[in-house]
Amino acid sequence: MEIKKVYFSQKMSLYSPIQQAKQPLPFFQSHQESRDAFWRSAKKQCAFKAVSKKYTVYFTIAKSRGDVIFNNLLIEGETFEWKKFFRYMEACARFFIKENCCFLFQSPLSEEWLRIFHKNGYQGTTQLNKKLVYHTALVLGGGAHGAYQIGVWQALKEHDINFEIITGTSVGALNGALILQGDMKKAVNLWKKLSTRQVLALPEMAAVEDLRERFYRERRQMTKTALIEGGVSSAPLEKMVKDNLDLSLLKHNPKIRLYTVSTKLPELAEVVTDIQQTKTEEIPDWILASASFYPAMAYRKIGKNKYADGGYRNKIPIDIAINKGATEAFVVDVQGPGPAKKIRMPDIFIHWKCQTLWTLGSFLLFDSQRNQLNLQLGYLEMKKRLGYYYGNWYTFHSVKPARTYWRGFLSYLTKEIQLELSFFKSIKFWQKLRNLYKNRVVPETCGLAMLELLAKKHFLLPNEIYQVDMMIQMICQQDIKSMPDDLLAQIGQLSTEEWRRYRKYQQKIQNERTKTVYFDYLLQGKRKDRLQHELLKQPVDTLLILYLYYLKEEQPWHKNFHMKS
């Protein structure tokens, strides 16, 4: 099941299917009243669409502290029996992570309707309520960037969200064991201080301040050692695991089950290990086997068999969580190499993807500064998934001011510069913007998308919670013509691909300078025809430049009159 918000701007594309959808419950006196009410709720951003293999359900909700309250509902597709219907809607309610599923009606229900609700476990008359039952899993993917996963756990723990099952591959197996122990401080401190030599047995290297030079030296050293020795020894990782894990505590945890994934060699067969059911002395072996990225690292021998990283067969083990009884899962993908295993999820299985759009650094080369950044990213991403903050690339207390600024900008383009904005009706424009933003963009969220893209161009880091006004001020003060001197020191070690993009952007800086000067000339000279030409030729790039100009023009007003927006 996939649940997405429905925006009013989608009315044209969704008009036909919603006109064919019907309300299964008597929220309104007619189906048409229900459809009209759905679009009114879409204007208030309270409308959603749930899609599964058989059904598409459109619904609107209100939320209180512990309740999800359905107040309108339309179904497209064949009708199902009541038991399946309520299970489906309760799955939709679990998506919002509340205690109770409620249905609120404007008029008293008939005895027959009350009988149907009460038979399916609901209580009440006008508002029908039922306590939701959760069997939650935490799915920890492979990919070395384990600090991000611990950041996610910090946010979950902060809001008392518990899970019955943990499944982990590679670094996810190690973190699963740390989480099973429940010692947050130990897990955070471990990742904050972790370096490559605490994981892999590499020869000592002279200290190097330059991050790029250090990266290439460590990579060459790792490659050479792996080739000579048939995989770098993970003896330091083994010591760290044994020093930090309480095996008795892991073995006898009564509330959470931990399952790890490894790959048996040479068959390349997936092996799932129930950590609590294995021998106590073998627990470190199975965790290390799951994290042995052979041939870069040495394989792990358990008994007579050889095992390597579980990511070769199942890098994001959602299917194991489902097979062990999970009805929903927080899935933490940390950008491990290789494709994910294809699985078929049950219609009523809910999963929340907890992954960042930002790259997380080098694979197998660990850096304490980058780990601290990734910890913060994981924490903030999970807080957004839980609905406490907002944003896509960045994290905001509220994004409403972004919509206000954007409306002001569009008015500036049409009324002051008198530009024509027909490209907003072009599918290509929205496709390009979505590809650049790497997420869904609709007219209602366009202002936020453009603001975040500007923030990226101006090197703002994503590891803090922003106010929209504060972000705009920082964007306007940051010179796009050069990267901040301390940027790399704040980020930490980069990956090969990140270094490549870093060099590429340094080469593009001159082009950015030229563009800025050119558009400043057009705006100062009010060259409407040239501006219109550029806007139609390259709408996304041109909009970003014009939006920055507009925001800079607005800054003096906002400094003195902060309530303008």
Annotated model-derived regions:
Residues I3-V6, G121-T125:
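Short secondary-structure junctions
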Residues D36-V57:
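A short helix-loop-beta-strand connector motif used in the catalytic cores of GNAT acetyltransferases and
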Residues K44-Q45, K98-C102, K324-T327:
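Short, high-confidence coil segments that cap the C-terminus of an alpha-helix
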Residues G66-N120:
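Acyl-donor binding region in acyl/amide transferases
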Residues F86, I150, A173:
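Residues forming the Rossmann-fold NAD(P)(H) cofactor-binding site
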Residues G168, G172:
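Gly/Ala-rich beta-loop-alpha elbow adjacent to hydrolase catalytic centers
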